[in-house]
Amino acid sequence: MSPRARRCTDRCARMSERSMNATTETPTGKCPVAHGTGGTQNRDWWPNQLRVDLLNLHSPKSDPLGAAFDYRAEFKKLDYEALKNDLRKLMTDSQDWWPADFGNYGPQFVRMAWHSAGTYRLADGRGGGGRGQQRFAPLNSWPDNVNIDKSRRLLWPIKQKYGQKISWADLMILTGNVALETMGFRTFGFAGGREDTWEPDQDVFWGSETAWLSHRTLEKFDAPLGATEMGLIYVNPEGPDRNGDPISAAKFIRETFARMAMNDEETVALIGGGHTFGKTHGAAAESHKGPDPEAAALEAQGLGWASNYGTGHGADTIGSGLEVTWTQTPAQWSNFFFENLFKYEWVQTRSPAGAIQWEAKDGPDIIPDAHNPEKKHKPTMLTTDLSLRFDPIYEKISRRFLENPQAFAEAFARAWFKLTHRDLGPRSRYLGPEVPREVLLWQDPVPAVDHPLIDDADAAALKAKVLASGLTVSELVGTAWASASTFRGGDKRGGANGARIRLAPQKDWAVNQPEQIDKVLKALTRIQGEFNLNASDGKKVSLADVIVLAGNAGVEEAAKAAGHDVSVPFAPGRTDASQAETDADSFKWLEPAADGFRNYQKDGLAVPAEVALIDKAQLLTLTAPELTVLIGGLRAININVDGAKHGVFTDKPGALTTDFFTNLLDMSTQWKAAGESNDVYEGRDRQTGELKWTGTRVDLVFGSNSILRALAEVYAASDAKDKFVTDFVAAWTKVMNLDRFDLA
């Protein structure tokens, strides 16, 4: 374990100790909560306990709609135009309990949509608006999401009307689009297809800070974090750690937006476009604000931040503490943001709540009041707005947008679409009448199938040629795994479709063993070429399909070597992407720092290898049983990087046996660390001391962790051989098809 990983676990232990020391006993010494969720929990006692439970998230047990519910089918029944018309009416239907600024809810709905999608992180594909997670903690109570609860509550009558024909996840993004359109902006398009989840994501690492708005320096701003302070979407609008410095703020803006896959032009367009509308809220000190939604009283009914200042809403609203309105037409698209940014000199001032902001020096009173048509204000800006003028790179882009409003509008439309659709996945998932026709590079496009597909007889013939090619079972299975296991369940990127394993950057990743991959792919490409040259009726097979088919052939051979006759399911229809259709800079983030399924980890891994294994399994949407059976099977076949013998607890490598489990759980073997790093272990005969096996932390955790051991015992039992092969084939097929949304 690296020193960094050890510090990580020690910090968790200290946090838990502080928590336990802060508890108090009741006068009687009895538990004050007489139900199963009360009292000290396992993680209070063992804070470093492996989070196997993360693999159980979003199970059918938490879904009220049931396994038979088909969201795609329901969405297609939606009266899309009627819904949009209802949303248009909502924009100016101001409610007394939460009056609309400038008589238009549009700006706050733009913010709602932005903050739903804006949690996306390129590094691990998590976050974003694709699951409707803004409804749940922690996002529903982040300081940066103050009063967005009101936006969702305003939407509830419309969600109630259309029911399950549109998810909350889709509705929040669509509402942002409609808001922009009603304020005179032409959007790039909209695609539905986001399915709601029904409980908070527990797998997203938002940071280890224990206080809201804890500042992170650039030096400590580790991936995959996408915000500079705990509880913010991106950066502190007052500047880093509230320093009021636009220049230093620009560095943080550039870093955070890059982690969301946005370049400098997209960043400037998004900030300028978003701040064309609406205002911030800082009518008085934040001490007037009540608790956030998760901490609010029962009778608040899920609403938070109730204010005791004045009316608590309208002109008296307290949100971020800043009191800024950027443009003369805050409910209408314009170029006033950039015009004001460059027209005035700016002096630092304070909002009524005491937050750092900027006011136009000697500026005229031209900015409308949000609730009093008789009042006007001087132009105001945030520290982070001024970054677009005083950072030399941002300044050039901003001036171009100032001089060319059409270029600004086009850039904002495209950046907004990317922001709100980045985690929706490939175009095959897109639904609705407003899906743009243009194919965009960041969508990871693959060509459409333009030929008849192979049938079962063709697949059998291809597998026979693969097995006669001289490639080993390990090479076939390992290559297919390398191709398919790049999939990430968060943003639906990666997977075998496209055969991008043959392209940069994947072909050069150390985990993919470039020399071996090159050898295997050359052989498979020859087989593909021969088939396509000689096939009748115009049939063709893609290399992507051949890679998966070859892996299936390897699994079948491994099962045969263990005495089992199985047929691994196969669905043709993958196509091969080109290098021009592959954004290498974006795909580099899919390279695994660790892949426990191949017993691989980079030097200096930031977390223990078993933690990285759970993370990888969760990205692959695997359950704990699926994780367990895959590890056992892949160790038996031995797809370890560089052919390492760690975890290959068998004298029959290449056969799909349960030997990994039986030998790991064999009490005649005693395990000890092989070095100070505690990354590799030796298993010796308990009586003679003879070395029998070597294993990694990933291998040994299936005997150490109580949950994983319980699962390992199932497959180590004498009656489990058939079940093991059946379960392995099912889990293998799942991984091979993770990106086959066309099969749904």
UniProtKB/Swiss-Prot annotation:
Positions that bind heme b: 275
Cited InterPro entries: Catalase_peroxidase, Haem_peroxidase, Haem_peroxidase_sf, Peroxidases_AS, Peroxidases_heam-ligand_BS
Protein keywords: Heme, Hydrogen peroxide, Iron, Metal-binding, Oxidoreductase, Peroxidase, Signal
GO annotation, biological process: cellular response to hydrogen peroxide; hydrogen peroxide catabolic process
Cofactor(s) needed by this chain: heme b
Cross-link Tryptophyl-tyrosyl-methioninium (Trp-Tyr) (with M-260) per UniProt, renumbered positions: 114-234
Protein name: Catalase-peroxidase
Organism: Azorhizobium caulinodans (strain ATCC 43989 / DSM 5975 / JCM 20966 / LMG 6465 / NBRC 14845 / NCIMB 13405 / ORS 571)
Gene of this entry: katG
